[in-house]
Amino acid sequence: NLYQFKNMIQCANKGSRSWLDYVNYGCYCGWGGSGTPVDELDRCCQTHDNCYDQAGKKGCFPKLTLYSWKCTGNVPTCNSKSGCKDFVCACDAEAAKCFAKAPYKKENFKIDTKTRC
């Protein structure tokens, strides 16, 4: 679920950046998304959005699905082995790792999505 995703983000980035820094970043981070991603981090969010869309098509509710995971050496690892739980956990874990690797550009936080996306 979204609370677990927040914790995964903080696991992967070693707590160096708040999950709130990713809300309203670029064209895809936060609720919704459209247009062309502005950078690598925004592409991580687009991929995560697409993953959640795929989960929805499988009958899952990704924003609400509780799963089992652990943080080992700043790497989120899924423990869930069942359908929706495993799928959603993988979406979140891959996104958290992607966020941790991608450069964060302050100029892409709270951009005007009407003109830039």
Curated annotation (Swiss-Prot):
Enzyme Commission number: 3.1.1.4
Reactions mediated catalytically: a 1,2-diacyl-sn-glycero-3-phosphocholine + H2O = a 1-acyl-sn-glycero-3-phosphocholine + a fatty acid + H(+)
Keywords for the protein's UniProt record, in alphabetical order: Calcium, Disulfide bond, Hydrolase, Lipid degradation, Lipid metabolism, Metal-binding, Secreted, Toxin
Expression (tissue specificity): Expressed by the venom gland.
Cofactor: Ca(2+)
Residues bound to Ca(2+): 28, 30, 32, 49
Catalytic residues identified in the record: 48, 92
Class in the EC hierarchy, top level: hydrolase
Described function: PLA2 catalyzes the calcium-dependent hydrolysis of the 2-acyl groups in 3-sn-phosphoglycerides.
Protein name: Basic phospholipase A2 pseudexin A chain
